[in-house]
Amino acid sequence: MDELKKLAGVTAAKYVKNGMIVGLGTGSTAYFFVEEIGRRVKEEGLQVVGVTTSNRTTEQARGLAIPLKSADDIDVIDVTVDGADEVDPDFNGIKGGGGALLMEKIVATPTKEYIWVVDESKLVETLGAFKLPVEVVRYGSERLFRVFKSKGYCPSFRETEGDRFITDMGNYIIDLDLKKIEDPKQLANELDHTVGVVEHGLFNGMVNKVIVAGKNGLDILEK
């Protein structure tokens, strides 16, 4: 599957042209996209400026000598390539399994062409089997946890090595085990209006193109 993920990442990189501002995604498939951009910068003289979606991707891009700018310094991104944890037929998705959902959404929002690279296991009829990440400020997070629990959202604080996971922005993540999300837009609206929630992993209708790596090769889905 890694070879197919690599092929998907390399294929996505073909949408990147000279002079573009490029959003550099985070995750196992987006990794190969960033590697291919680095190769083209070195071997082909590709001239681009990258905007990263996590500290991990920043380190990777710097190691490849890809010129970078902060999201604060740009108004429009030409193309962003990132991964996703689930994608439904309406191009709604769940992201944030790697904990970078806030930065990923900040980069995705001003992007003209937003592309996801995924393996075929990420294609689902209904979102929700993958736990929905909700990034929350630390202050009041226990109360927010109880609110989610009272709604039957089966929350859990994300942990790493026995301690609470802390995002690149210094927040906690509460994962919601919803099993099935019948109305992603309604849930997104609810979370958007919940005090203490910084961001959530529902990316509804944002993506333009999904490059799928499967056992039979690549499939490119478009709106």
UniProtKB/Swiss-Prot annotation:
Keywords, in A-Z order: Isomerase
Catalytic activity: aldehydo-D-ribose 5-phosphate = D-ribulose 5-phosphate
Entry keyword Isomerase: yes
Recorded superkingdom: Bacteria
One of the GO biological process terms: pentose-phosphate shunt, non-oxidative branch
Active site (catalytic residues): E104 (proton acceptor)
Top-level EC class: isomerase
EC numbers on record: 5.3.1.6
Gene Ontology MF: a single term: ribose-5-phosphate isomerase activity
Binding-site residues, substrate: T26, G27, S28, T29, D82, G83, A84, D85, K95, G96, G97, G98, K122
InterPro entries registered for this protein in UniProt: NagB/RpiA_transferase-like, Ribose-5P_isomerase, Ribose5P_isomerase_typA_subgr, Ribose5P_isomerase_type_A
Associated pathway: Carbohydrate degradation; pentose phosphate pathway; D-ribose 5-phosphate from D-ribulose 5-phosphate (non-oxidative stage): step 1/1
Transcription regulation listed as a keyword: no
Record PANTHER family: RIBOSE-5-PHOSPHATE ISOMERASE 3, CHLOROPLASTIC-RELATED
HAMAP family: Rib_5P_isom_A (MF_00170)
Function of the molecule: Catalyzes the reversible conversion of ribose-5-phosphate to ribulose 5-phosphate.
Quaternary structure, from the entry: Homodimer.
Family statement: Belongs to the ribose 5-phosphate isomerase family.
The protein's name in its UniProt record: Ribose-5-phosphate isomerase A
Species in which this protein is naturally found: Streptococcus agalactiae serotype Ia (strain ATCC 27591 / A909 / CDC SS700)
